[in-house]
Amino acid sequence: MGFPKVERLLINYKTLDEFKKFKGCGAQELSMLEELQANIIENDSESPFYGIYYGGSLIARMSLYMKRNGGEPFEITGPYLELYKLEVLPTFQKQGFGQMLVNHAKQMQFPIKTIARIHSAGFWDKLNFNPVSVTDGDFYIWHPETNLNAVTNEESA
């Protein structure tokens, strides 16, 4: 068995069965089951779901959406990713699988916006996300380092 990797999840009934394993493991606000069912009904071929399989079973998942423009108060200009939900089965938590999912999103080189749910602020801090408080709630934002380095290199020239 090879090392687990992040892959885009297919929108089908097999994935729906895998998602049912997560029901009851986490908070209701993390449930993606209804979201996946809606995508199956709409026959949406562009899956927003990513996951990690281990031993043939889905052990970690996230939903990731491309947004057009963040604007103010989010400190994002232009397109960005919204990492809407991330969940790892309890048996596999604290083993780096959540970080693997986030790193996969970071490799796309767009700013990322997320909400720290269920005592996860420390997780987002560790992954270099910055907290942003607005009237709608508290968010965490990550900016691609390449953009920051480009500015730094120009300033030093």
From Swiss-Prot:
It comes from the Bacteria. Its EC number is 2.3.1.-. Keywords: Acyltransferase, Transferase. It holds the Pfam family Acetyltransf_1. Residues 9-154 form the N-acetyltransferase domain. InterPro entries: Acyl_CoA_acyltransferase (IPR016181), GNAT_dom (IPR000182), YlbP (IPR017274). It is an enzyme of class 2 (transferase). GO terms for molecular function: acyltransferase activity, transferring groups other than amino-acyl groups. This is Uncharacterized N-acetyltransferase BC_3921. It comes from Bacillus cereus (strain ATCC 14579 / DSM 31 / CCUG 7414 / JCM 2152 / NBRC 15305 / NCIMB 9373 / NCTC 2599 / NRRL B-3711).
